[in-house]
């Protein structure tokens, strides 16, 4: 019976189902928050920004929000992060298209294969980089803009998005949105 329920849940891919996975009272949301307030904060930012980026391209916003939130879930179990993240998602009966994005975490095991996966990867890389740098570094918006350009251009140059179907125009649209979206990377979010 549990297996049948899990199969049914994995087949649910409606945008409203993804919102259920992001509610404060959802067990894995609570687990991430208990695991690390820093990881929880990071997950919230990646989730929100990924959804905004998907909206700019007319893609699945709530899938990107859910994937952004759970992208680093494997950290709760330790290495190997990707495999552990996929196992947690499978045990929670996440929809297959969400599990696929988690399976493509950082392009480590599998190439990034969808536009939504590329967006989540791009946003996670930028948020991670901005988290690592101190507030002094961002005394001007120019510095923040340069970090975003450099991070995304370096990742793109590796070919990591080549199999995602993301066009150069779409990549540039997302990059420009991230650069111009000062409110998305409010320095008050970084500690």
Outline where the language-model segments fall:
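Membrane-interfacial segments at transmembrane helix termini in multi-pass membrane proteins
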Residues: 8-31
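Divalent metal-dependent catalytic cores for phosphoryl transfer on phosphate-bearing substrates
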Residues: 27-155
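Long, hydrophobic alpha-helical segments that serve as membrane-spanning/inserting helices
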Residues: 138-141, 146, 150-191
């Amino acid at each position: 019976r549990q297996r049948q329920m899990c199969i049914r849940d994995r087949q649910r891919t409606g945008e409203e189902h993804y919102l259920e996975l992001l509610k404060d009272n959802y067990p894995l949301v609570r687990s991430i928050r208990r695991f690390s307030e820093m990881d929880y904060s990071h997950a919230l930012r990646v989730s929100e920004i990924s959804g905004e980026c998907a909206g700019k391209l007319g893609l699945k916003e709530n899938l990107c929000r859910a994937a952004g939130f759970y992208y680093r879930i494997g950290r709760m179990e330790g290495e190997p992060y990707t495999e552990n993240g996929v196992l947690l998602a499978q045990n929670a009966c996440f929809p297959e298209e969400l599990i696929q994005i988690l399976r493509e975490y950082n392009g480590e095991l599998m190439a990034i294969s969808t536009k939504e996966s590329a967006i989540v990867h791009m946003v996670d890389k930028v948020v991670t980089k901005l988290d690592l740098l101190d507030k002094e570094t961002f005394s001007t918006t120019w510095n923040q803009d340069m970090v975003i350009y450099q991070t995304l251009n370096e990742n793109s140059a590796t070919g990591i998005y080549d199999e995602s179907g993301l066009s150069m125009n779409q990549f540039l649209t997302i990059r420009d949105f991230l650069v111009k979206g000062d409110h998305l990377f409010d320095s008050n979010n970084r500690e």
